[in-house]
Amino acid sequence: MSQNGDDMNKAMMVDGNAAGGMLYDVFSAEMTASPTECAHCGRHEQIGELLAFVHAPGIILRCPACENVLMRVVKTGEFTYVDARGAVYLRIAK
């Protein structure tokens, strides 16, 4: 991707709090304060501190340190797909 494309993508990212509503719908819990760990660089963050790309069919959450994709969430008419393979763990409160 070109430098201009990278800059535009970064300009469209917001903090992970923007994903809070969709994550609540998926997990039935407040997720923005939930801790996670990046599988690439090992950084520990709360979901609300991640970078969120919300201008897509779903959301993409990235590590603010290395920009590794920690989680993708896509809702379709029938299903919700969650891919969290970029996270070592995601802790969900009871």
Language-model features, listed with the residues they occupy:
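Helix-rich interaction surfaces within compact, conserved domain-sized segments
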Residues: 33, 88-94
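Short metal-binding segments enriched for Cys and/or His
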Residues: 67-81, 92-93
